[in-house]
Amino acid sequence: MTALLPFYAPFGLEAGLDEAGRGCLAGPVVAAAVILPRDFHHPFLTDSKQMTLRQRNELKRLVREYAIDYAIAEVDAAKIDEINILKASILAMHLAVDQLTHRPEHLLVDGNRFYSYPLTPHTCIVKGDSKYFSIAAASILAKVAHDAELYLLDQEYPQYGF
């Protein structure tokens, strides 16, 4: 059974944010924002890096089905080179929040750095994807989307072994 927590704030809509692709040498950085119902839980939902491809794909389907709202955004390699990977990761998270149709009242961010999002308080949680359901869900959506981008790059440039 998982030890993840359902939410951080005691009330309101809370979006979990995470990214994938910060350690990559190629491709975009991808971020996801996920708002889950307060009663959502799943015994196998955890940090996407701890899952198999099959588990991630199954949980991606489950998250998309049960989420109140979710969004995925990316920042391409050219922009990463222009502003640096940390700023690009945070930008991707902001872009994901921008795409949500529901306005969260609180943002739970995986990691220790984030630039304030307008009119929405946030809390940074180191290793948040192994502590909170919404961040773990965002971790899965971001990782699956990033892996899909790398697959496309591999098809176009097989000599690099993405």
Each language-model region and where it sits:
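RNase H-like, Mg2+-dependent phosphodiesterase core
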Residues: M1-F162
